[in-house]
Amino acid sequence: MEDIQTNAELKSTQEQSVPAESAAVLNDYSLTKSHEMENVDSGEGPANEDEDIGDDSMKVKDEYSERDENVLKSEPMGNAEEPEIPYSYSREYNEYENIKLERHVVSFDSSRPTSGKMNCDVCGLSCISFNVLMVHKRSHTGERPFQCNQCGASFTQKGNLLRHIKLHTGEKPFKCHLCNYACQRRDALTGHLRTHSVEKPYKCEFCGRSYKQRSSLEEHKERCRTFLQSTDPGDTASAEARHIKAEMGSERALVLDRLASNVAKRKSSMPQKFIGEKRHCFDVNYNSSYMYEKESELIQTRMMDQAINNAISYLGAEALRPLVQTPPAPTSEMVPVISSMYPIALTRAEMSNGAPQELEKKSIHLPEKSVPSERGLSPNNSGHDSTDTDSNHEERQNHIYQQNHMVLSRARNGMPLLKEVPRSYELLKPPPICPRDSVKVINKEGEVMDVYRCDHCRVLFLDYVMFTIHMGCHGFRDPFECNMCGYRSHDRYEFSSHIARGEHRALLK
């Protein structure tokens, strides 16, 4: 009976406390069910605190939860005072949140552009975050909050200060596992590791060359021809390159011309070999394979052997017949030398069996006794002795001049041609040999070429540089004095032999 009465009293007590407790629950949703059970147990008295801990308390909570739901469902909707409390509280809270959100949006939109970055109000620089913007603003304000306690250096960022402190401590935390290299920064170690690896990740897509560093690839693209040609829309670059090459070729030709003129101006320089152009077609039969292939040979010899040998050969031949000299030796120079004392116009003639055919010439009536029939036209077969005196040559020359009347008594520079009249030595460039109607040298194109004459050796030159080099061998005081060693010759034959043999070299030593 006592248990039944106790349960009945408990039920009546719970029914009376439901309206008050329901109002408290509706007013404060933050209270837990344990607090609600404490309020329920408070009506029971302190003697029942120990009894509530157990299965009975769980039953009470379940009954309370079911009854609470029934009360909320059975609550009439017409009573507007009780449900207005939570609704009005939530409205005030939402209004407060809206105010805070509006303030946040205004402050955020004022510094953030439409692209999602934050702009500096001083210079307008866009930053990706607020922290980056604050660090940037320190560059305007001069603020450096991070200071080194050892040397007093200040920095705008903490990372820079930590990196600076490593300089004092000597700490190098990033070490290479392949060598003894150590550094303070991770990116430096990454770049160092590429030196050990064979991998070259940066590759030129135009020529295929690969590099370990991006900077090396950029430097390569600046001079990569394939890349430069691909970047140009047209062939302007190639045309410009061809134009530059053409200019370089012309400049090279000018430099060679200057070098040739400088060599000609050196009066004390040794004579140099001259390689004749193959396009020249003269009335001589010569082999073009004798030309020098190495320029060093031309510089080392530096002597005009052919010009002197030709002078000795044709001056020792029969003086009363026209003569065209061929190179006597393979090392001789490919410059045909024509005697200036024979004013005969030469024309092109085909060679057959090594012997020249009849040459077309002007009507020159020479004495038959001066042209022996037993002697051929070849200069090597000329039987005239080289010991003939100059007077014999002069007499024969005067005999030819008187019969033909084709050569002037004086050269164009006013100097007499005969040896008995004193002659002065001049290094000035003489005009071409006597008038073109007396002696003609025709090239392959049929053009008449200029011929330059040495009055002392009576040698003709087709090239002015070779003529100048030859004239540099003559002395100033005496034309038959060697300008290189001072040796004095009695006549032009001895002088030519001295130059050809190079006797002055022994004297210099």
Swiss-Prot record:
Consequence of substituting residue 159 to R: In IMD84; no effect on homodimerization activity; no effect on heterodimerization activity; changed localization; changed DNA-binding transcription activator activity; changed sequence-specific DNA binding; binds novel and non-specific DNA motifs and acts as a dominant negative through its homodimerization and heterodimerization activities
Zinc fingers, C2H2-type class: 118-140, 146-168, 174-196, 202-224, 452-474, 480-504
Segments carrying the region annotation (Disordered) are 1-86, 364-394
Q: How is it modified after translation?
A: Phosphorylation on tyrosine residues induced by IL2 is required for dissociation from HRAS and nuclear translocation of IKZF3 in T-cells. Phosphorylation on tyrosine residues induced by IL4 is required for dissociation from Bcl-X(L) in T-cells.
Give the top-rank taxon of the lineage listed in the UniProt record for this protein: Eukaryota
Q: Where is the composition biased (Polar residues)?
A: 1-19
Q: Positions of the region Mediates homodimerization and heterodimerization?
A: 452-504
**Glycyl lysine isopeptide (Lys-Gly) (interchain with G-Cter in SUMO2) cross-link located where?**
61, 73, 100, 245
Tissue expression, as annotated, is: Expressed most strongly in peripheral blood leukocytes, the spleen, and the thymus.
The UniProt entry's GO CC annotations, sorted and at most eight, read:
cytoplasm; cytosol; nucleoplasm; nucleus
What Pfam families does the record point to?
zf-C2H2 (PF00096)
Q: Name one GO molecular function term.
A: promoter-specific chromatin binding
Principal localisation: nucleus
Q: Where in the cell is it found?
A: Nucleus; Cytoplasm
| Keywords attached to this entry | B-cell activation, Cytoplasm, Disease variant, DNA-binding, Isopeptide bond, Metal-binding, Nucleus, Phosphoprotein, Repeat, Transcription, Transcription regulation, Ubl conjugation, Zinc, Zinc-finger
Residues found modified as Phosphothreonine: 326
Q: Where is the composition biased (Basic and acidic residues)?
A: 56-72, 385-394
Which residue windows are transmembrane per the record?
Answer: none
Swiss-Prot/TrEMBL GO biological process terms:
B cell differentiation; mesoderm development; regulation of apoptotic process; regulation of B cell differentiation; regulation of B cell proliferation; regulation of lymphocyte differentiation; regulation of transcription by RNA polymerase II; response to bacterium
- Induction remarks: Up-regulated by TGFB1 and 2,3,7,8-tetrachlorodibenzo-p-dioxin (TCDD) in activated AHR T-cells.
* Reported function: Transcription factor that plays an important role in the regulation of lymphocyte differentiation. Plays an essential role in regulation of B-cell differentiation, proliferation and maturation to an effector state. Involved in regulating BCL2 expression and controlling apoptosis in T-cells in an IL2-dependent manner.
What the record says about family reads: Belongs to the Ikaros C2H2-type zinc-finger protein family.
Could you give the subunit structure recorded for this chain?
Answer: Homodimer. Heterodimer with other IKAROS family members. Interacts with IKZF4 and IKZF5. Interacts with IKZF1. Interacts with HRAS. Interacts with FOXP3; this interaction may be required for silencing target genes and regulating the suppressive activity of FOXP3-positive regulatory T-cells (Treg). Interacts with BCL21L isoform Bcl-X(L); this interaction blocks the anti-apoptotic role of BCL21L. Associates with histone deacetylase complexes containing HDAC1, MTA2 and SIN3A.
Domains as described in the record: C2H2-type 5 and C2H2-type 6 mediate homodimerization and heterodimerization.
Associated condition reads: Immunodeficiency 84: An autosomal recessive immunologic disorder characterized by recurrent sinopulmonary infections from childhood associated with low levels of B cells and impaired early B-cell development. There may also be variable T-cell abnormalities. Patients have increased susceptibility to infection with Epstein-Barr virus and a propensity for the development of lymphoma in adulthood.
Designated name of the protein: Zinc finger protein Aiolos
Species this chain originates from: Homo sapiens
Q: Which gene encodes it?
A: IKZF3
